[in-house]
Every structure is written in structure tokens, then in C-alpha cells.
Amino acid sequence: MPNCANALENIKKFVFEQNRYILPQVVDALKNNFKGYEEIKNAFWNDNNKFGNNVKEVDAIMKQLLDFSYNGGLKAKKLGDETFILTPKKDFKRIESNRTICHYEGHSMHQKYGDDFNMIFNLGCGTFGQYTLMGKNVGASADGRCSGKPVAANFSSVTGTMKNGIGNALASLKNLKLSRFPAGVAVDYCIDDTNGENCDSYFENIVREFIEENGSILTLTFANTDELKNVFQICEGVRNKFLSSEALRPYSYIAVRVGGFNAPFITIPKEQQCTYLNRITK
């Protein structure tokens, strides 16, 4: 969703408001993975109107996207109830046809199990640790992302676009009504703590602000950026067979948040390592 919100904001701004590009140009740029359209890619990527920076225009687009998702869930719930749960009183042919599509025949769930039987739709927004794999099957997008590159992790800002600090990232969540998604809407933040200057109260204040800004699910970690960059270079040496894998052993204790779970930094794929390094913020 963050990629989509950023892309729509770029199209709104550069195509319809500033008339800097025309829509066929943008479409052709995406089809060609920005080859020959580097100016468009740079304009899209470097624009500051990105979700997670407390920018009202793109936050409003995100609110619309969440509204579409929520209303779609309500419609799916209604269709599911009509098709499987409730005992039909009309539209018998349509309901029978819908059941056939799902390879189901027979009585409604209420007829089988009683009126207390229900079907729960738990809506949420998340990628877990699959954001790199998901991106491999997605073409170039109008937020400046190239084909095959990772998408945003969970509901976090697109990696590398959180420019205004964690306070503004949290403020972007305030008016999105995330509590309506019972399966959760997760954000992952990694704070640079290279110099060890952040005390416990600093992290407590982030959690308090997250709650006050109506956040849903938060994973918060801190990292020594210099140390992780050094470990990444050692991983590169191992990957390129310049170093023995034994060179990684002293760093096996360094765990990072992947998305739904923690893992040693040295064990995650290169793309996820790069994503994590670019995610670290002040």
C-alpha cells in the first residue's frame, strides 16, 4: 500500500497538477522499467511527498486506499454470508451458482450448524518477511521503484523514503482508522543507535506516541549502523568467495527484525540486508 499511495501521489502531482508529464509517458516509462525515462524515475523517487512523512496529500490518498480495502472486505463478508451462511429466501439460482464456483453443494451453514454459526473476515495489511519476494513479481511502479525490486515492508514507509524522522512517520498514522482492521496493520521502525545515545525513555516515548497516534502493530528495533555496514561487507566477501564463512561467526549474535520474526543479520538474503540498512532512521 505505501508504494501505491506514493505512486498515485506522483501521478496526481506530476501529471494532473503540474502537467510535467503526460499519462502515456508514465505508462511507457513503467513498461520499459524506466529505461530511457531516467528523468521521470528520479523525479518520482526523489519527490518528498511520500507516505510516512506526515504529508497530508499522500496521507489522504492512503486513507482512500484503506477505505477501498475495508469496504471491499465488507462486500466480501456480505457475499460470503449470502452464499454460505444464511438460508436463502430469494436469488436461489445466483446463490447456487456462486456455491458451484466454490465446489460447494448442500444446505447453508445455518441449516447445518444453527443460527450461531458465523464466518469471520479478519482484514489487515502486512507482508511479513516476504516483501522482497513479492517485489520480484511486480513491475515498475510510479513511486520510482524498478521492476523486481522489493515493495514496502508491511505498512512501513517505502525503504529510503522516511525523511522526516519517526515522529512524523507516526503522525501519518493518526487519521487512518487502523483499528478497523482486526488482523493488524504493522509498521517496522529501526532506530540508529550507533553512539548508544538513546536511553530507555526515548523508546518509551516512541511507543507512547504510537499509541496516541492510533497505531495498530509496532515493531521497534535499534541498530549500530556502522557495525551492520561492516558485517554486510564481510557477508559480501563470503558471497564472492573472498572470505571464509567462518569470518561471519563472530557476528552471529546480531539479530534484526525481518517481518514477523527476528533472524541473525548474517543469515538473511542480500536484498533483505540492503533493505534493512536503508530502513535505519534517526
Segments (PLM) and residue ranges:
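Acidic, glycine-enriched catalytic cores built around paired aspartates
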Residues: M1-K282
